[in-house]
Amino acid sequence: MKTNCEFPLLCLLIVLVANVEGEVEDNELKMVKRLWRNWEDPEQRQLLDQEAEQEKQREKRLWRNWEDLELRQLLNEFAENQREKRLWRNWERRQVANEDDGEKPKELWRNWEDLKRRQVVDLNDEQKTTG
C-alpha cells in the first residue's frame, strides 16, 4: 500500500497519545500500524522514497518552467523596448532628413537635367563624328 506519511514515527506517536486518551478508534490505530509496517518494509520504504523524489523533481521542473517563463517575458519586454527605441530613432532620422528635403529634390532635379544635357551633347557629338 502506498502512503504519504513522511514521518511515520510522528504519526505513530500522535495516534498512540490519542489512543491513550481514548480519542482514536480502532480503524485509525490499524491504519497507523499499517503505515508503520509499510515504513519498516524496505521495498515499501524505497517506493515511498521514489515517490517523494519524483515529487521533488516535478516541483523543480515546474519551478524551472516558471523561471523560464519569467525570463522569456522579461526578454520579450526588453526586445519590445529596444524595438520601440529603434523605431523612434528611425522616425527622428526621417524627420531630420525631411527638414533637408527642400534642397535635396532641387539638387537631384538639377543633376538629372545636367545628365540629360550631357547625354544630348554626347549624342550630337557622336552624330557629327559618324555623319
Curated annotation (Swiss-Prot):
Molecular function terms from GO: toxin activity
Main subcellular localisation: secreted
Modified residues (Pyrrolidone carboxylic acid): 95
Coiled-coil residue spans: none
Positions annotated as RLWRNWE repeat: 34-40, 61-67, 86-92, 107-113
Known tissue expression: Expressed by the venom gland.
Record keywords, A-Z: Cleavage on pair of basic residues, Pyrrolidone carboxylic acid, Repeat, Secreted, Signal, Toxin
Assigned GO CC terms: extracellular region
Location within or outside the cell: Secreted
Record's signal peptide: 1-22
Propeptide positions: 23-94, 112-131
Family of the protein in this entry: Belongs to the scoloptoxin-08 family.
The protein's name: U-scoloptoxin-Er5e
Biological source species: Ethmostigmus rubripes (Giant centipede)
